[in-house]
Amino acid sequence: MSWPATHDELEALGRELVAGGLGPFGGYEVAFGELSLTGPAHRIVEGLTLLRDDHGFQQLVDICGVDYPERERRFDVVYHLLSFTKNRRIRVKVQADEDTAVPSVTGVYPNADWYEREAFDMYGVFFDGHPDLRRILTDYGFHGHPLRKDFPMTGYVEVRYDDELKRVVYEPVKSVEWRNWDFLSPWEGVERGFAPILPGDEKGEEAKS
């Protein structure tokens, strides 16, 4: 296949890799000049090995997650691969839930080590066979997984350095009390030849009349 590949060539590669659903991939999509593959999570090691050894995708660029809370298997685990020789990228997606571990691909791409730790830290996705699956971005004892859709925007605790105690302290988040903000601008409507009457302007209007 010539690279960069045309849409039809990517379609042909997708059909070849899916192979009637008998291989490690169950579906494919071509969009924006890139091929995305989907498959069962338990065959991800087989699938990535095939792409590395038979199709020249030597580099794992990233592993990321997507959260769909309304889905039974709420997470997509997305693997981004790069071929140096063909100058092309390919994407592989598998689905996972909160209880079922995805096989680790550190045996295929050793740099998956930290990527899988990040996915575990941010989404709570477990990777079976990972050599050291622990948090990598959040602090020790952190509660929850920040990139889940149901994680609160403010988090659960505030972490700061207390200069008096000379140590890091954890405190419950102190949210701002609800307020009825007035966003009305006195300049709104000026370009149309009038301006709104703001609270407190009533006396001025009465004096004019």
UniProtKB/Swiss-Prot annotation:
InterPro entries: NADH_DH_suC, NADH_quin_OxRdtase_su_C/D-like, NADH_UbQ_OxRdtase_30kDa_su, NADH_UbQ_OxRdtase_CS. It is found in: Cell inner membrane. SUPFAM superfamilies: Nqo5-like. Belongs to the complex I 30 kDa subunit family. NDH-1 is composed of 14 different subunits. Subunits NuoB, C, D, E, F, and G constitute the peripheral sector of the complex. NDH-1 shuttles electrons from NADH, via FMN and iron-sulfur (Fe-S) centers, to quinones in the respiratory chain. The immediate electron acceptor for the enzyme in this species is believed to be ubiquinone. Couples the redox reaction to proton translocation (for every two electrons transferred, four hydrogen ions are translocated across the cytoplasmic membrane), and thus conserves the redox energy in a proton gradient. This is NADH-quinone oxidoreductase subunit C. The lineage of its organism: Bacteria, Pseudomonadati, Pseudomonadota, Alphaproteobacteria, Caulobacterales.
